[in-house]
Curated annotation (Swiss-Prot):
Classification via InterPro entries: Aldolase_TIM, DeoC, DeoC/FbaB/LacD_aldolase, DeoC_typeII
UniProt entry keywords in alphabetical sequence: Cytoplasm, Lyase, Schiff base
Taxonomic source organism: Escherichia coli O8 (strain IAI1)
Main location per the UniProt record: cytoplasm
Cytoplasm found in the keyword field: yes
SMART domains according to UniProt: DeoC
Catalysis: reaction(s): 2-deoxy-D-ribose 5-phosphate = D-glyceraldehyde 3-phosphate + acetaldehyde
Enzyme class: lyase
Lineage: Bacteria, Pseudomonadati, Pseudomonadota, Gammaproteobacteria, Enterobacterales
Protein name: Deoxyribose-phosphate aldolase
PANTHER family for this protein: DEOXYRIBOSE-PHOSPHATE ALDOLASE (PTHR10889:SF3)
Family: Belongs to the DeoC/FbaB aldolase family. DeoC type 2 subfamily.
Compartments where located: Cytoplasm
Active site (UniProt): D102 (proton donor/acceptor), K167 (schiff-base intermediate with acetaldehyde), K201 (proton donor/acceptor)
Pathway(s): Carbohydrate degradation; 2-deoxy-D-ribose 1-phosphate degradation; D-glyceraldehyde 3-phosphate and acetaldehyde from 2-deoxy-alpha-D-ribose 1-phosphate: step 2/2
Length: 259
């Protein structure tokens, strides 16, 4: 197996196969569930809006892949600093049956100098998730923070508040995941000594098998080749799947989605 094939198979099994579009329908989510079951293995999860969780759960069960996890988003994509609304959305997502919640950190508040509200928001959402055995990923929106010190600070605050994962981006702004921001965030995980309990998720802009290989290489360099498993590493993507399957000898590499 070539290096690209090996990394593509790894990446496929770490994907949160995503559709977060305004025109999403039951039919599109059902199709996403079908795509998550591939000839070379399943993606780790799908990521969808909360209202589609019941139809996704039913579809995954019917197609014989109930182990594919269902992730959803809250405080999304705006990252407002209203803790009560973020918490209410997170509780609603849990009630719908989410296995994982990706909440947007109030990054604009941090840019304005307020570190406390981000901590409090993540902590409140974590408490709700922990009570239901739901994993919490925190989206810090690196492409808006831009500054390395702010990316580090948002990562640190999220981890201290209980994040199970830190995630780069919503996929809804001009700049999403970059290898540079990925390295900064994973260095925070390393420097805080939390690599056993905290994972990393690049999202938005990871589109090709070669892209995924680059991101995995950073993780391997920092933590060794065994760290990036589904508990510690995910790719938030949609069009990436077609490229990975093509690298693995399945399909033509074309995809209808751009996330």
């Amino acid at each position: 197996m070539t290096d690209l094939k090996a990394s593509s198979l790894r990446a496929l099994k770490l994907m949160d196969l995503t559709t977060l579009n305004d025109d999403d329908t039951d039919e599109k989510v059902i199709a996403l569930c079908h795509q998550a079951k591939t000839p070379v293995g399943n993606t780790a999860a799908i990521c969808i809006y909360p209202r589609f969780i019941p139809i996704a759960r039913k579809t995954l069960k019917e197609q014989g892949t109930p182990e594919i996890r269902i992730a959803t988003v809250t405080n999304f994509p705006h990252g407002n600093d209203d803790i009560e609304i973020a918490l209410a959305e997170t509780r609603a997502a849990i009630a719908y049956g989410a296995d994982e919640v990706d909440v947007v950190f109030p990054y604009r508040a941090l840019m304005a100098g307020n570190e406390q509200v981000g901590f409090d928001l993540v902590k409140a959402c974590k408490e709700a998730c922990a009570a239901a055995n739901v994993m919490l990923k925190v989206i810090i929106e690196t492409g808006e923070l831009k500054d390395e010190a702010l990316i580090r600070k948002a990562s640190e605050i999220s981890i201290k508040a209980g994040a199970d994962f830190i995630k780069t981006s919503t996929g809804k702004v001009a700049v999403n995941a970059t290898p540079e921001s990925a390295r900064i965030m994973m260095e925070v995980i390393r420097d805080m000594g939390v690599e056993k309990t905290v994972g990393f998720k690049p999202a938005g802009g990871v589109r090709t098998a070669e892209d995924a290989q680059k991101y995995l290489a950073i993780a391997d360099e920092l933590f060794g080749a065994d760290w990036a498993d589904a508990r510690h590493y995910r790719f938030g993507a949609s069009s990436l799947l077609a490229s990975l399957l093509k690298a693995l000898g399945h399909g033509d590499g074309k995809s209808a989605s751009s996330y």
